[in-house]
From Swiss-Prot:
It comes from Orientia tsutsugamushi (strain Boryong) (Rickettsia tsutsugamushi). Monomer. This is Arginine--tRNA ligase. Keywords: Aminoacyl-tRNA synthetase, ATP-binding, Cytoplasm, Ligase, Nucleotide-binding, Protein biosynthesis. The gene is argS. It catalyses: tRNA(Arg) + L-arginine + ATP = L-arginyl-tRNA(Arg) + AMP + diphosphate. A motif ('HIGH' region) lies at residues 138-148.
């Protein structure tokens, strides 16, 4: 069993015993469910020379039950000191409990990594629960820019993380293929089509899409229809162009996502919701629940009275679910609003029977959070669904020290394809995970082309390559040691230097780290972990290169060499597993 999992279970047993004893001496009923409300958090040490693992459980219990945290910490120490795998326990600060684990417990864990059984520690966390993750969902009005890549990679890697930990995952893209923006897209394409037919450069009015990427769509229309569309009325040619434009741009979006290894299982059409009369049925359902009414909205803050005309309209009572205002369900022309479409779409997700529904939104959609929560609360009658909304903050593309501004409307943006052609898939995917999703990310094109520590994917891949080179060299030059290693007869207790043990301790935290990453929907933890593992391995490599006593291959000591080959293999195994989840190539030679 993983060291962290075993320690957590044993702390839980002791915590339950302590809490029950405190409950028995208290008349307060507020402590009845205390065991369920106090999480046991284990942190690996930042100072490996003093302890291995720390927990603040005594401080949490003390705060909840009005006790002295130092006294409780010492009680934990007394009860846990007898466990055979724990070498030492110390109390620090206001009640942190610091554990030193027996050295052989760490070294023995290498066998679990080498035989692959470590995966069992997290492969059933999800218990086959169904998860829907919606990510990207950019309007099909133009190519995806590098800012979209962040949500794309975050969603794709989160899906992979959930799958490898036992969840059933549906990757989804909501296609906004109707409404004003699609009308404007069709008008823009028509002007490009006209340009192709007449040879005269189109003048694109403000509010439309001026990007030259639409010329190719205009060319396709010209090949299929000749000049026929020029003879049709605007409603007639727009109806034709809308479908062609959306289909072409959606195919372009799919192709760009494929470049960086991002895929979706479902592309859900908003237009189909309108065409199938589903929206009306869902609104009727909310009307029965008395969540819909006819009324007037207040004048929006900051809007001039000259531009505001109050009108009676159909509204959803989203404020009773915590939204800051009720939401319109219909436009002035009587057609359904975007919000009404969102309600029908959410209802569809609920009916598909998901246990978790995750929305991944860009920073410009933060205002949607309260609306989505209101919709789910209104529709999920039995509260069976766990909703989570994740915001992906901005990506600042840096070129030569200057931030590049991006806008589809202005036609000035750096596409995913542009960046892919410079740095490739692996760099894009890894770097998008080097910070938590809700933190702004600077994407420096110059640094990410370097073969240095500033290029994190190179740094991790290079650790994998270096470890592999050790094995190849040993196979050719240390046959006896390689035979001991390859027949699983390595003596891990020979790995006794401080640096070797530090590396093993990082390897052993993999499953614990992954458990936290999936439960908090934080795949960036994998990238951060891999960088730490690579750094520790490179440090050991450099030490062994300069000191005969630290070399991986010691020609006069086959048993020590075999143990160090096992350590190098364990490093490769965990890096391979981490890169597999992130969707990055493991290279053998650099």
């Amino acid at each position: 069993m993983n060291i962290y999992k075993r320690l957590k279970q044993d702390i839980d047993v002791v915590a339950t015993s302590i809490i029950n004893k405190l409950k028995s001496t208290s008349d307060s009923k507020e402590f009845d469910s205390l065991n369920d409300t106090i999480p046991i958090v284990l942190e690996s040490s930042k100072d490996v020379n003093s302890y291995d693992i720390s927990t603040n459980i005594a401080m949490l219990i003390a705060k909840k039950m009005n006790q002295n945290s130092i006294t409780l910490a010492n009680l934990f120490k007394k009860k846990l000191s007898h466990y055979p795998y724990i070498d030492n326990i110390t109390i620090a600060g206001p009640g942190f409990i610091n554990f030193v684990i027996l050295q052989e417990e760490w070294t023995n864990y290498l066998a679990i990594i080498l035989d692959g059984s470590y995966r069992k520690e997290y492969s059933s966390i999800g218990n086959n629960k169904k998860v829907n993750i919606e990510y990207v969902s950019a309007n099909p009005t133009g190519p995806l820019h590098i800012g979209h890549a962040r949500a794309a990679v975050y969603g794709d890697v989160l899906a992979a993380l959930l799958q490898c930990t036992g969840y059933q995952v549906t990757r989804e893209y909501y296609v906004n293929d109707t409404g004003v923006q699609i009308d404007n897209l069709a008008k823009s394409v028509y002007l490009r089509y006209k340009q192709v037919i007449t040879g005269q450069v189109a003048d694109i009015p403000k509010g439309l899409y001026p990007g030259e990427y639409l010329i190719s769509v205009g060319t396709k229309l010209a090949k299929e229809y000749g000049d026929k569309l020029l003879t049709l009325s605007e409603p007639e040619y727009l109806n034709i162009i809308k479908d062609v434009a959306v289909n072409n741009l959606l195919q372009s979006i799919k192709a760009d996502l494929a470049l960086i290894g991002v895929r979706h299982d479902v592309f859900f059409s908003e237009k189909k919701l309108h065409d199938s009369n589903v929206i009306s049925k869902v609104i009727d359902l909310l009307s029965v629940k008395k969540l819909v009414y006819t009324g007037e909205l207040s004048q929006p803050k900051g809007q001039s009275s000259d531009n505001w005309q109050p009108r009676s309209q159909l509204l959803f009572k989203s404020t009773i679910f915590g939204d800051n205002q009720d939401r319109p369900l219909q436009k002035e022309d009587g057609s359904w609003s975007y919000f009404a479409s969102d309600i029908a779409y959410a209802d569809n997700k609920i009916k598909r029977g998901f246990d978790y529904v995750i929305f991944i939104l860009g920073a410009d959609h933060i205002g949607y959070v309260s609306r989505i929560k209101a919709i789910i609360q209104a529709l999920d009658f039995n509260q069976d669904i766990t909703l989570d909304i994740k915001i992906c903050q901005l990506v600042k593309l840096i070129e030569n020290g200057v931030a590049v501004k991006m806008s589809k409307r202005s036609g000035s943006f750096t596409t995913i394809r542009d960046v892919y052609e410079i740095v490739g898939k692996d760099v894009i995917r890894f770097f998008m995970l080097t910070r938590k999703n809700n933190a702004v990310l600077d994407f420096d094109l110059v640094k990410l082309q370097e073969q240095s520590r500033d290029n994190p994917v190179f740094y991790v891949q290079y650790a994998y390559v270096r470890a592999g080179s050790i094995l190849r060299k040993a196979k050719d030059n240390a046959n006896i040691a390689y035979e001991i290693f390859s027949t699983n007869k390595s003596d891990f207790s020979l790995l006794s230097t401080k640096e070797e043990l530090n590396l093993i301790k990082i390897l052993a935290v993999w499953s614990h780290m992954l458990d936290g990453a999936v439960k908090n929907f934080e795949p960036h933890r994998i990238a951060i972990y891999l960088q730490k593992l690579a750094a520790e391995f490179h440090a050991l490599w450099n030490l062994k290169s300069n000191d005969l006593d630290y070399r991986f291959i010691v020609l006069n000591d086959n048993n020590l060499t075999a143990a160090r080959l096992a350590l190098a293999t364990a490093v490769r195994e965990i890096i391979r597993e981490g890169l597999k989840i992130i969707g990055i190539t493991c290279v053998e030679v650099m």
